[in-house]
Amino acid sequence: MPLIKFKPTSPGRRSAARVVTPNIHKGSPHAALLEPQSKTGGRNHHGRITVRHIGGGCKQRYRVIDFKRDKEAIPARVERIEYDPNRTAHIALLCYVDGERCYIIAPKGLKEGDKIISGPNVPIKLGNSLPLRNIPVGTTVHAVELKPSKGAQMARSAGSSVQLVAREGVYATLRLRSGEMRRVLAECRATIGEVGNEEHNLRKLGKAGAKRWLGVRPTVRGAAMNPVDHPHGGGEAKSGQGNPHPVTPWGVPTKGYKTRKNKRTQQFIIRGRRG
C-alpha cells in the first residue's frame, strides 16, 4: 500500500501522510455485527478520571469480532475487507456456506473472494485457524489464544505476528515481535499469516486536531504544572523535576520502573523482551 503526502495548503496538510487502501470497502458495515459504544472520557462510575488523556473523539460503533474462530469445518468466503475505527488492523467480513456472517482480523494478503476455514486438521493456508499442535514449527501466525477457547489475545494489531519456534509436550514456544519467548498450551488456536495494514505506523496525523478526532487529549508535562497537581510541579522558571527519580502524578516511580507483578504467569516466559 503506497504512502501519499498532500499539497502544503496548510500546516496540517503539509505534515500529514496517509496510507492508501484501495481495496477497503467504501460502504456501511454489516449492521447485524454492530454494537453501540458510549464514551467515558476516561472516568469511572464515580466520575473520577482513572485513565488520563481520553475524551471527545468521533462517535463510533463497535464491530463484533470473532476471536474464537470456533465454527469448525464450515467453509467461509471473504465478502470484503473493511476499516475498523476501534483498532489499527483492518477486518474481513466472512460469509459461511450456511449464511452466517462474522468479522475477523484481516491477515496480510487476504482479499475478497478468498475461501478460509477453521478446524483441527484444516490446510496450512492464509487465514485458516487451527490449534498450535497442528501447525508446523517455523510458521508465522497471529491472533493467538493464551487459554484454549478463550479467544485470541496476542498479535492482533496492525502488522503484528508471532512465530512458532518449538513444540514440546503440551506446550508450544512462541517468539513475539518484541523478542520475548513464551510458552502457551498447544491446544490454543492461532490463525495462519500476519496481520495486515502493516504500514499503519508510517502514517502522520499532521495536526493536533486529528489526534482529538481519535479521542486523545493532550499530555502535559508534570514540570509544567503547579505543586498541587504533580510531584514535579512548581519551582522558578523552567525548573527540573526536583526528585531523585521521575514519578507519576501519584508518586509511583516511572521511566524504567518495572511494574509487572503477575508471578503466576512468569513461569511461561522463557526469555523476556529485554533479554
UniProtKB/Swiss-Prot annotation:
Oligomeric and partner information: Part of the 50S ribosomal subunit. Forms a bridge to the 30S subunit in the 70S ribosome.
Role according to the record: One of the primary rRNA binding proteins. Required for association of the 30S and 50S subunits to form the 70S ribosome, for tRNA binding and peptide bond formation. It has been suggested to have peptidyltransferase activity; this is somewhat controversial. Makes several contacts with the 16S rRNA in the 70S ribosome.
Keyword rRNA-binding applies: yes
Matches recorded under Gene3D superfamilies: 2.30.30.30, Nucleic acid-binding proteins, Ribosomal protein L2, domain 3
Entry's family note: Belongs to the universal ribosomal protein uL2 family.
Protein name in UniProt: Large ribosomal subunit protein uL2
One Pfam match: Ribosomal_L2_C
GO biological-process terms attached to the record: cytoplasmic translation
Region (Disordered): 226-261
HAMAP family linked to this entry: Ribosomal_uL2_B
Highest taxon in the source lineage: Bacteria
Keyword Chloroplast assigned: no
A Gene Ontology molecular function term of the record: transferase activity
Keywords from the UniProt entry: Ribonucleoprotein, Ribosomal protein, RNA-binding, rRNA-binding
Gene: rplB
Organism: Xylella fastidiosa (strain 9a5c)
InterPro entries per record: NA-bd_OB-fold (IPR012340), Rib_uL2_dom2 (IPR014722), Ribosomal_uL2 (IPR002171), Ribosomal_uL2_bac/org-type (IPR005880), Ribosomal_uL2_C (IPR022669), Ribosomal_uL2_CS (IPR022671), Ribosomal_uL2_dom3 (IPR014726), Ribosomal_uL2_RNA-bd_dom (IPR022666)
GO cellular component, one term: large ribosomal subunit
